[in-house]
């Protein structure tokens, strides 16, 4: 073990939509694949194909015609542990090609993750994968670290869930964390619906992937939604064309900004919830009056659903309208924010000061899964 290369910690960020995994110290994850487990619908159908009982990630995606697909993480929280174990197994052995018993593992968790879940993660790492050490960190806190700060409020919006997490000197303030069950998957659904209204048919899972691509490539957030709607009626400046895999070209105009507008107006999809701007404001208001100034001045965006062009300006405009007029508002949208949770994990796990923070196997053997609450907070 003298060779430092051997004991490089592993960092695994398990999202609702994508798993991001790699080695501490790297500046980007080596493996990014869908959080899906597929099981054959009919056993014995693929005779002689060396059929596996389960497929994970891209392979499950490409064979989906003969599989039943499951997402083991719902709204950011693990709901199916057998499938989750399959995903971790695939991550270590097939994607990173490492032996987990030789590396400390840093895992990420959603804010307000139930205690039993943290214990279960800890147990699986030590008992199934025999890791020498592990740690569980809150996703939004890692995003803040990645932006080079320890105090601020993070709006983390991925595929399955969004959270606003106020953090003071490195610690998340649980009483002020707010969760919004509105994220990338809902935006894709909404865009499918708008395009269907226009006469295009997108219904299957394969077509859903196409719409997700349209969303990622062409959507943007309007600074002023009403005005943008007016502009789109009279001018073709917002129109863009997109070539479908079959060669058909579709034109999308107002849909480009109507789709992500849902983040600011959840009522557009019939949700009774505050938009991301108001949720961020509400989160700040749940914090002690003395630290609000620090939070308003450091609003950090993180996650794939914050990648829309125009989002930072719009957030800034909306929060300025809600906050006290003398307050200085700063919204930070780091270019690498799609992976900033993973990057924060990579930074944290490679700090020399962090080395005494790991839960060692010996400590686990002595105290059991509840050790995670004492060491990871």
Curated annotation (Swiss-Prot):
**What's a Pfam family in this record?**
Actin
**SMART domains this protein is in?**
ACTIN (SM00268)
Reaction(s) catalysed (UniProt annotation): ATP + H2O = ADP + phosphate + H(+)
Q: Name one GO cellular component term.
A: actin cytoskeleton
Which GO MF terms does the UniProt record name? ATP binding; hydrolase activity
The UniProt entry, under InterPro entries, shows: Actin (IPR004000), Actin/actin-like_CS (IPR020902), Actin_CS (IPR004001), ATPase_NBD (IPR043129)
Tell me the function of this protein: Actins are highly conserved proteins that are involved in various types of cell motility and are ubiquitously expressed in all eukaryotic cells. Essential component of cell cytoskeleton; plays an important role in cytoplasmic streaming, cell shape determination, cell division, organelle movement and extension growth.
Further comment found in the protein's record: There are at least 7 different actin genes in tobacco.
The name on file for this protein is Actin
In its UniProt entry, the species of origin is given as Nicotiana tabacum (Common tobacco)
Source taxonomy lineage? Eukaryota, Viridiplantae, Streptophyta, Embryophyta, Tracheophyta
């Amino acid at each position: 073990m003298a060779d430092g290369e051997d004991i490089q910690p592993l960092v695994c960020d398990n999202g609702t939509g994508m798993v991001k995994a790699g080695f501490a110290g790297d500046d980007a994850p080596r493996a990014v694949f869908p959080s899906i487990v597929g099981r054959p619908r009919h056993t014995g159908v693929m005779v002689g194909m060396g059929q596996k009982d389960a497929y994970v990630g891209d392979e499950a995606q490409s064979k989906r015609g003969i599989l039943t697909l499951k997402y083991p993480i719902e709204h950011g929280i693990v709901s199916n542990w057998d499938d989750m174990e399959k995903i971790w197994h695939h991550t270590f052995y097939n994607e990173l090609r490492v032996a987990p018993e030789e590396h400390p593992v840093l895992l990420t968790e959603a804010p307000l993750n139930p205690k039993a879940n943290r214990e279960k993660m800890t147990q699986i790492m030590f008992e199934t994968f025999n890791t020498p050490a592990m740690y569980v960190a809150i996703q939004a806190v890692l995003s803040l670290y990645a932006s080079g700060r320890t105090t601020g409020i993070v709006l983390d919006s991925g595929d399955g869930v969004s959270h606003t997490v106020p953090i003071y000197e490195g610690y998340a303030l649980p009483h002020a964390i707010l969760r919004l069950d509105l994220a990338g998957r809902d935006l894709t659904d909404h865009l499918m619906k708008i395009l269907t209204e226009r006469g295009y048919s997108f219904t299957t899972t394969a077509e859903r992937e196409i719409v997700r691509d349209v969303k990622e490539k062409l959507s943007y957030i309007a600074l002023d939604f009403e005005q943008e709607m007016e502009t789109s009626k009279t001018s073709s400046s917002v129109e863009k064309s997109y070539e479908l895999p079959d060669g058909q070209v579709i034109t999308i105009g107002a849909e480009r900004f109507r789709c992500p507008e849902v983040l600011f107006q959840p009522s557009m999809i019939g949700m009774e919830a505050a938009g991301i701007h108001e949720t961020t404001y509400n989160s700040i208001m749940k914090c002690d009056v003395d630290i609000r100034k620090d939070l308003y001045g450091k609003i950090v965006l993180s996650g794939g659903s914050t990648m829309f062009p125009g989002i930072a300006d719009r957030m800034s405009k909306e929060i300025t309208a809600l906050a006290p007029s003398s307050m200085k508002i700063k919204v930070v949208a780091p270019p690498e924010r799609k992976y900033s949770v993973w990057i924060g994990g990579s930074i944290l796990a490679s700090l020399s000061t962090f080395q005494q923070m790991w839960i060692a196997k010996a400590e686990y053997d002595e105290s059991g899964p509840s050790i995670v609450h004492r060491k990871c907070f």
